[in-house]
């Protein structure tokens, strides 16, 4: 559905770009049948979620304007905190056992102005979408947009030291073939 919002077209997802070097149809179909004005409002709302300082996914934004991401955070409640649990001091999702915590959701597309990718992230028992799912979506989206490891300046300044450490750790465990650009699969 996110790809449909991004393009205002009926989109059938495809997992394979080409077979034996022959590119397969893109999956983009007929117009969705929703007015451009309504789609523009939804897209703008998703852009604000990620790129406005008050947006729930602002901390997971992509810095480069030409690669700006639009998205929507979400939380799927697994169960209510009961009155008895509240009486025992359980007041937050984090206070519950892992298997009872809410699921974190985030959907996104990018670049905002000329969408090429759409994705959905679900982190089971991850809590809120902005804290658990949106950062994963941003990292996956950056990998897709850059065709590999993105530069640190693609990330918000406050995250760059942590991201640099994570990238260095990943380089240590990557298979040699992946480093040489060869696919292991």
Regions found by a protein language model. Name each.
Residues 2-31, 37, 46, 50-151:
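Active-site beta-strand/loop architecture of penicillin-binding DD-peptidases
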Residues 145-185:
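Gram-negative outer-membrane assembly/targeting C-terminal domains
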């Amino acid at each position: 559905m996110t790809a449909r919002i991004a393009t205002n077209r009926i989109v059938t997802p495809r997992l394979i770009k080409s077979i034996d070097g022959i590119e397969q149809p893109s999956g983009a179909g007929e117009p969705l049948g929703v007015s451009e004005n309504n789609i523009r409002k939804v897209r703008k709302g998703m852009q604000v979620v990620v790129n406005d300082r008050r947006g729930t996914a602002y901390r997971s934004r992509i810095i480069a304007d030409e690669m700006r991401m639009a998205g929507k955070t979400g939380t799927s409640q697994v169960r209510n905190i009961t009155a008895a649990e509240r009486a025992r001091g359980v007041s937050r999702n984090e206070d519950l056992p892992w298997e009872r915590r809410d699921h974190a959701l985030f959907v996104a597309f990018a670049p905002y102005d000329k969408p090429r990718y759409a994705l959905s992230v679900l982190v089971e028992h991850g809590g809120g979408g902005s804290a658990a799912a949106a950062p994963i979506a941003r990292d996956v989206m950056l990998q897709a947009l850059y065709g590999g490891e993105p530069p640190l300046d693609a990330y918000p300044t406050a995250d760059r030291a942590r991201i640099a450490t994570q990238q260095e750790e990943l380089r240590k465990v990557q298979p040699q073939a992946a480093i040489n650009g060869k696919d292991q699969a």
